[in-house]
Amino acid sequence: MKKYTILFGAICAIILAFSLNAKADFTSTLSFSNLPPGNPGPYGTVDVSLTGQTATITFTAAAGYFFGDGSSAAVELNTDSFTEAFVSESPSNNFKAFAFDQQVDGFGSFDLAVDQKNFAVKLTSITFTVTNTGTAWASDADVLAVNANGFDAAAHVFSTSSGLTGFAAETPGEHHIPDGGATATLLGLGLAGVAGIRARFGRN
């Protein structure tokens, strides 16, 4: 009986690990830029948190950089049908409009972009939501996809050290692959295994 208790505990630990992984936000690091030399990355991060079929996407600038102007935040989405909504910006709102299928200099076209009025307000964070009305997302990692140039997100950045602006995205070769429900499937298999063990040995 002792060995089954240990096995049961091990499976529970695995399930907990998978469940924590499923709840963890997906993050893309903006570490590659067309800024001139002397403006090293990282330039910021893109955090994706999924609740139901609504993804909250937050761009956060790294120290020494800010977001602003056109294509201040842009994402490629793993869906053909969605609705978008502005949430907030820091230190103050400078939001102008959303743009669709917008070209970001050096990084290709993105499904959705956030345009600011200008660089008058240098933003440290931009948050918006995307609600999927197409094929369901299985996890946070399912929300973004890579565009034709191989990037899932990009931003228009301002360097405080040089006073120059440019665009940034994740480093080439660090692109993610949508989860496609694999985590949920493994979690389900783990739960089924626990149920089987309890049914077989629960009364002993």
Please report, for each region that a protein language model flagged, where it lies by residue.
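Bacterial N-terminal signal peptides that target proteins for export
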Residues: 1-8
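Ser/Thr-centric signal marking residues that sit
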Residues: 5, 54-58, 183
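Serine/threonine-rich, low-complexity intrinsically disordered segments
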Residues: 7, 167, 173, 185-187
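Bacterial N-terminal signal peptides
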Residues: 9-17
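Sec/Tat signal peptide C-region and signal peptidase I cleavage site
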Residues: 18-24
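Mature extracellular "passenger" or substrate-interacting domains of secreted, surface-exposed proteins
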Residues: 25-176
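A short, hydrophobic C-terminal helix/tail in secreted or cell-surface proteins
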Residues: 178-198
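Short, charged juxtamembrane terminal tails flanking transmembrane helices
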Residues: 200-204
